[in-house]
Amino acid sequence: MPEQQRLATLDSSIVSRLPAYSQSLFEAKTQKGLTFEAIAQHLGRSEVAVAGLFYGQVQASAEDVDKLSELLSVPKEAIAAQMMGFPDRGRAGPMPPVEPLIYRLYEIVQNYGYAFKAVMNEKFGDGIMSAICFNTTVDKEVDETGAAWVVITLKGKWLPFTRF
């Protein structure tokens, strides 16, 4: 018997930190039995960008709102104004994170942040990696033993510091 697709749902402990539309979108997503991958295909965006829309961390276009409204059967008027406004990023969860998976990502930056910085500086010079001119993907790889591995790709434009 094949395993049933499990869906990401909204963690009730962070609802108060998210835009009002987040709960409606997650409820509709669950009701329709849709994954972020399926929604991303409908919107023509990446899975991570679509999940970011649901959490209020990514600004939606008018086309995103139209397509989400149609796919999820959510009234456009109920989501358009907030989703097309300016996101209030970085407030979805506590700092440091307490959710174990999110904490592992935080821990990666704690443990390897200076190493990443040193290697980037050697390759690109003095500057930073943009999180604005940026994209990311999450992929799954299975090794020869059958173990599943997460592959997270972070791609940001290099922004050199300017002399002034």
Swiss-Prot record:
Gene3D superfamilies: Cyanate lyase, C-terminal domain (3.30.1160.10), lambda repressor-like DNA-binding domains (1.10.260.40). One of its GO terms (molecular function) is DNA binding. Thermostable for 1 hour up to 60 degrees Celsius. Coiled coil: none annotated. Induction: Induced by cyanate and down-regulated by arginine. Changing residue 130 to A/T: Abolishes catalytic activity. It catalyses: cyanate + hydrogencarbonate + 3 H(+) = NH4(+) + 2 CO2. Its EC number is 4.2.1.104. Belongs to the cyanase family. This is Cyanate hydratase. The lineage of its organism: Eukaryota, Fungi, Dikarya, Ascomycota, Pezizomycotina.
